[in-house]
């Protein structure tokens, strides 16, 4: 196997920003932020918007998380409104 072609596989903390839930796992994701975990060691931190703790499929609750999607930006840019147009 060739050396130095694969990203570093390391322990990383993922933090769900909507529920403040964090979990430690392994990943190749790159990040500049770090956090001190419960074991006293410092790990890279990745902030995510949705995890199993906040996703409606896993929680059974409907929750509106709107961060302004591409469709809204398109409609705003081209002056389109919702509904049918008159012909």
Curated annotation (Swiss-Prot):
Pfam families the UniProt entry points to: Ribosomal_L31
GO biological process: translation
Lineage: superkingdom: Bacteria
GO cellular component, one term: ribosome
Keyword Ribosomal protein annotated: yes
GO molecular function, one term: structural constituent of ribosome
This protein's record includes keyword Ribonucleoprotein: yes
UniProt keyword terms in alphabetical order: Ribonucleoprotein, Ribosomal protein
Subunit-structure text: Part of the 50S ribosomal subunit.
Family: Belongs to the bacterial ribosomal protein bL31 family. Type B subfamily.
Record PANTHER family: 50S RIBOSOMAL PROTEIN L31, CHLOROPLASTIC, LARGE RIBOSOMAL SUBUNIT PROTEIN BL31C
Official protein name in the record: Large ribosomal subunit protein bL31B
Organism: Halorhodospira halophila (strain DSM 244 / SL1) (Ectothiorhodospira halophila (strain DSM 244 / SL1))
